[in-house]
């Protein structure tokens, strides 16, 4: 089970076998602190910044999201480069997330054209005033990212206009991991969900294995029979990285439209991300 669920599913490994691995694409992650030496992603961390994680250096969340996006054996885009900014989300203060995003934008400014950071994966909701304080600081930073052409994807959606793409958790079928039509929205413990809005996109979260490291040099893996939407955001960012490798001219809005228009229909009638159809459509329609 541990090994089988390293597979991202939905045909991603067939794309990787064709050389579509996110190579040359720069992405960012804002999440909890991370020990950067895990073999899954040690050579993928381009830069690391700590906004003030109270002296903590390790977490459960950090290595999980990094491995799901760009892990060597787990990730959707194992050759993407990660700019990682750690922020203490448990303090429920979005000023740290805003600081993290501004750091990403500073890194982005220093990068040459053709090597810009394309997407920021945020497995949290720093724009939610019901959960966090100082959301105005986050919203201002997200607006700056939008102006810079950097797509910010959180559990609430896409950047300053989250309803452009509304993420939901999906369950992979253990017996048909590569078939998006065998997926459904929700969690393994649920019977199913109703059909959501047209811009909803369900992302694999359950039946996944992630990297783990709580003590420097003690590398491990954990299997999750049930994962939350936190696992889906880096998955989606990874699929986007595959798309940008195939066609670097895509804007953030364009890549979201393609993800939505190529989605498969799951067993409950909801839209499930379909990486293979997404890439095939880009190659056909854009000559990529």
Show where each model-derived region lies.
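Extracytoplasmic/secreted envelope proteins and their assembly/folding machinery
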Residues: 9-13, 62-70, 97-102, 135-142, ...
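Sec-exported extracytoplasmic/periplasmic mature domains
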Residues: 20, 70-74, 78, 102-110, ...
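Solvent-exposed, acidic/flexible segments
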Residues: 4-9, 57-62, 90-97, 131-138, ...
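Extracellular S/T/G-rich loop segment that most often corresponds to the catalytic His/Ser-adjacent loop
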Residues: 31, 147-150, 155-245, 249
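N-terminal domain-start motif of subtilase-like serine proteases
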Residues: 1-27, 51-55, 183-187, 273-274
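Substrate-binding/access-modulating region of protease and related hydrolase catalytic domains
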Residues: 22, 87-171, 222-234
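Subtilisin-like serine protease catalytic core
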Residues: 14-46, 53-97, 113-118, 193-197, ...
């Amino acid at each position: 089970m541990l090994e089988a669920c390293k597979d991202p599913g939905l045909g991603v490994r067939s794309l990787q076998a064709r050389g579509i691995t996110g190579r040359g694409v720069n992405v960012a992650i804002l999440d909890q602190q991370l020990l950067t030496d895990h073999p899954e992603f040690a050579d993928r961390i381009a830069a690391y910044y700590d906004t003030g994680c109270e002296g903590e250096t390790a977490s459960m969340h950090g290595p999980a999201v990094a491995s799901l996006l760009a892990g060597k054996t787990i990730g959707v885009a194992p050759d993407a480069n990660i700019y990682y900014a750690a922020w203490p989300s448990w303090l429920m203060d979005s000023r740290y997330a805003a600081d993290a995003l501004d750091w990403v934008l500073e890194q982005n400014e220093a990068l040459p054209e053709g090597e810009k950071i394309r997407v920021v994966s945020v497995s949290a909701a720093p724009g939610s005033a019901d959960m966090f304080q100082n959301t105005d600081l986050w919203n201002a930073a997200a607006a700056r990212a939008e102006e810079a052409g950097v797509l910010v994807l959180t559990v609430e959606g896409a950047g300053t206009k989250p309803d452009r793409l509304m993420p939901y958790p999906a369950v992979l079928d253990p017996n048909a991991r590569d078939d998006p039509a065998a997926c459904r929205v929700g969690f393994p413990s649920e019977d199913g969900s109703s059909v959501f809005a047209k811009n909803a996109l369900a992302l694999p979260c359950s039946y996944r294995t992630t990297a783990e490291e709580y003590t420097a040099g003690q590398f491990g893996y954990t299997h999750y029979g049930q994962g939350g939407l936190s696992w889906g955001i880096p998955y989606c960012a990874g699929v986007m990285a595959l798309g940008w490798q195939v066609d670097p001219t895509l804007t953030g809005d364009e890549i979201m439209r393609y993800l939505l228009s190529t989605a498969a229909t799951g067993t409950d009638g909801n839209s499930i991300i379909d990486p293979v159809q997404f890439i095939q459509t880009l190659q056909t329609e854009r000559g990529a």
